[in-house]
Amino acid sequence: MARRRPTAHVAHPAQNALFAMTDLPTPAAPRRLFTALFPPPEACAAIDAERQRWPGLPRRLHPVPERMHLTLQFFNAVDAPHERDWLAALQTLRFATFEITLTQAELWRAPSGVIAVLVPEHTPELAALHRATAQLARQAGLPAASNGFKPHLTTLRHAERTTLAPLTEPIRWTVRQVDLIWSDLKAQPPQYRRLGQFGRRAP
């Protein structure tokens, strides 16, 4: 019988449709996992409003607002033992809340094509959180890099014909936890499944 993990924090109600959830059996095959920072709904709405202003948008806008995030670590195939160790390591994560401010829109060339991203101000708090989560991933036996971190939030895929405009104003949100996400590409439609939320200080 498959072993079950302890139940993680409950997902935000506004995201339930996209983040099915948590008490899932131990996987038989490696899974596509990443840690990330998700903006709250009001910040997602502001990001979506900004991209709606850009000329040359594709017919369908991906990602949808609820799936927008800033990735900390990403691994394409994590087996069950490493996943369990990563979950255990992330349980020890603690950090003070801090603010992310998205200030600039840029076009980047990715393996899947041109994407539009929003880039945040560089802050010591975000850099420290990336280092801390990378160290926890390495403790779990995963090859996380500490250097070369380029924080960004992907706002639009298939942006080859899109012309960006400066943001009307910076977009801010307060970071309170780190999410561990399983990107389930086999689901129809593909889903993000939240495996846990980490880093909240005790009240």
Please give the residue ranges for each predicted region.
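Histidine-dependent nucleotide/RNA phosphoesterase domain, centered on the 2H-phosphoesterase fold
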Residues: 2-203
